[in-house]
């Protein structure tokens, strides 16, 4: 895309655009993350054998909290929030440990640990200058690249019909995913001006219509929901267990590294500059405190969504007002269950067709960031070793078998966390005198 095309206000953080122009871009962001936002709740609810009506209410709360968190990231309150176009949602990072704690203490034990762990992360986030020292550009670039690689399997799983689907890979899913992907590409080729950046929304609509006529869209629950429903505060009695709190706090630290990576990627890819200390601090504080708020509504921790970083990497649309309309749609979905049911009916294969290209864009952007850091021997060592260990080891999780369950739960399948730690350690121990 030429520099001339970037002059449209939609590509500016605070560009003035109309509501009618903003809504399609906001809706595109919400559709890109909607299924991933509610899936963690459903997984953990199944493990703790939560009644269907309760898990349904939590799905509604998840949408409300994600919308509130996104608004705070966009428009900070005091030092809470980054001021960047970061979309928030319920994090998959905590699913494994939530299942373990939930099976041991029940869902109330999970909520107590989320409340305390979120407050601790929020407090640590205030020390941005210490985080900044740990993440020079080469570390941030390596983490961004790993985020892209970690999401490729997510896109592929959705393309085939969704994780755990007994009919995974069947022809209907592949057909719908392919039609969606081709629609995205075709729209991007033939559309003009900033309308090109709505290719994901166009693909989602085309894929949804095709999936509907193929019998893949379930609308049966639409007739059963209330018109308006206010999410319940404190739906579970919280319990506070030291081991559960400690376990969640460790995962909150891992989540913070992912947030740092997402925030760094957002500024590098979307705003074409380095991330600022106050942006890192605001992102982490928002992650922590909004996660604590999430527990009050009975939901799991909330964090920045890499899927939406991928969307910005592909479209370069960073306008905060446009993303804000998406946050408002999420809040409305939390208050009007029918809207939530409609959005949740989006088939996984449709989502997969759109996200494949988005997630690949993060990988390419990360590689570009590494190139901008320079290919001296120190940077090459940090990037290559961190990516090799982080991606390689997590693709072979049995290599973690000698470690305690807590370590395995945190790192065995989380390549972003492993990449961050390895890159951070190498940055500390490798002498800067080796730079060429």
Residue ranges and their predicted role:
Residues 19, 45-81, 249-320:
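Membrane-embedded helical hairpins/re-entrant loop segments and their flanking transmembrane helices
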Residues 190-205, 227-236, 248, 261-285, ...:
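Hydrophobic, small-residue-rich membrane helices and short re-entrant helix-turn-helix hairpins
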Residues 1-25, 220-233, 268-275, 279-283, ...:
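Intrinsically disordered, low-complexity non-transmembrane regions of multi-pass membrane transporters
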Residues 3-7, 37-41, 45, 180-190, ...:
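Juxtamembrane interface elements at the cytosolic ends of transmembrane helices
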Residues 1-85, 93-101:
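N-terminal signal-anchor module of multipass membrane proteins
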Residues 101-220, 325-436:
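Membrane-embedded alpha-helical modules
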Residues 57-58, 79-92, 133-142, 195-201, ...:
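Short, non-helical or kinked segments that cap or interrupt transmembrane helices
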Residues 20-32, 169-180, 198-199, 214, ...:
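Hydrophobic, membrane-embedded alpha-helices of multi-pass small-molecule transporters
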